[in-house]
């Protein structure tokens, strides 16, 4: 069911992009929009992992200098039948983690120093199982495409507004319509953001479920989320960006976004995630 929901949201996002491109430049605008999206998606496919790891100054580690962490990842990948990903530690005291990479064969998982300090081994395993579930279901690629399309829609909408104000658009009479301009300049980018956030939230629930069944202990991840949420409500990660916030296991901006409408959250509420994990715990126990 989650796959169909995500597919529907991705199609909706693409339709918003087509609508904006078509209004701005007609058939030519649609073609340009598709070419832009294709170019950005290709770039993201091959380089987004390197860019995000560099942004957070992630340091590669192996079994020699991070034996415990390496052992946990190795054990989980064997259980999940996944290739061993590259492992990184981020020099950051705020506890958090993310996965990146275009597919399971080119994946990386990164955790902050703060996470390794405040979580016990079981909780760390729960977090890493969550991240490996993202890898297993190609969530990184899905999230990257959604983020790029949403950004492209905002950019094209801004061009439309500038072009109309400057009177340079050949379809100036049509574009001058204030209602249509409001839709292009405000409503369309807003709709794109809402859809992007919905995709992100759906994938978080799916990764939580994957972690629960991979470890067999949903309570490990639930306990980790409780600690991470408590810490993130008091501190914000250095270099945190809105573009990559959806990648982390908890929002790196913490309480700064807690009062926003649910439509604009990159993650489901932690209380909802924990409640679902508790339900899964009972489900797993009944199946034993």
Curated annotation (Swiss-Prot):
Keyword vocabulary terms for this entry: Cell inner membrane, Cell membrane, Hydrolase, Membrane, Metal-binding, Metalloprotease, Protease, Transmembrane, Transmembrane helix, Zinc
Protein EC: 3.4.24.-
Cofactor: Zn(2+)
UniProt GO MF annotations: metalloendopeptidase activity; zinc ion binding
Main location: membrane
Keyword Membrane (UniProt): yes
Record InterPro entries: HtpX_protease, Pept_M48_protease_HtpX, Peptidase_M48
GO biological process: proteolysis
Matches recorded under Pfam families: Peptidase_M48 (PF01435)
Entry keyword annotation includes Transmembrane: yes
Membrane-protein topology: Multi-pass membrane protein
Active-site residues, as the UniProt record annotates them: 131
Transmembrane domains' residue ranges: 6-26, 28-48, 140-160, 179-199
Localization of this protein: Cell inner membrane
Binding positions for Zn(2+) per the UniProt entry: 130, 134, 204
CDD domains: M48B_HtpX_like
Cofactor binding comment, as recorded: Binds 1 zinc ion per subunit.
GO CC, alphabetical: plasma membrane
PANTHER family given in the database record: PROTEASE HTPX
Record family assignment: Belongs to the peptidase M48B family.
Protein name as it appears in the record: Protease HtpX homolog
Organism: Campylobacter concisus (strain 13826)
Source lineage: Bacteria, Pseudomonadati, Campylobacterota, Epsilonproteobacteria, Campylobacterales
């Amino acid at each position: 069911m989650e796959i169909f929901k995500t597919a529907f949201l991705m199609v909706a996002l693409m339709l918003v992009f087509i609508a904006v491109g078509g209004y701005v430049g007609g058939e030519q605008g649609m073609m340009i929009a598709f070419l832009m999206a294709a170019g950005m998606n290709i770039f993201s496919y091959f380089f987004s992992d390197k860019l995000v790891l560099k942004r957070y100054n992630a340091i590669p580690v192996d079994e020699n200098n991070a034996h415990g962490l390496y052992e946990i990842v190795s054990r989980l990948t064997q259980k999940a039948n996944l290739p061993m990903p590259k492992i990184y530690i981020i020099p950051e005291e705020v506890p958090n983690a993310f996965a990146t990479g275009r597919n399971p064969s080119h994946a990386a998982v990164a955790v902050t120093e703060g996470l390794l300090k405040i979580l016990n081994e079981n909780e760390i395993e729960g977090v890493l199982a969550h991240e490996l579930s993202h890898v297993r279901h190609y969530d990184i690629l899905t999230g990257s495409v959604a983020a790029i399309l949403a950004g492209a829609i905002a950019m094209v909408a801004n061009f439309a507004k500038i072009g109309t104000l400057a009177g340079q658009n050949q379809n100036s009479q049509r574009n001058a319509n204030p209602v249509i301009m409001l839709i292009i300049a405000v409503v369309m980018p807003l709709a794109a953001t809402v859809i992007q956030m919905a995709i992100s939230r759906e994938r978080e629930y799916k990764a939580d479920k994957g972690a629960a069944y991979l470890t067999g202990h949903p309570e490990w991840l639930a306990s980790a989320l409780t600690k991470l949420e408590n810490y993130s409500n008091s501190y914000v990660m250095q270099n945190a960006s809105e573009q990559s916030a959806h990648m982390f296991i908890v929002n790196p901006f913490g309480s700064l976004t807690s009062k926003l409408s649910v439509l604009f959250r990159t993650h489901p509420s932690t209380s909802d995630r924990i409640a679902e994990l508790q339900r899964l715990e009972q489900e797993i126990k009944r199946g034993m």
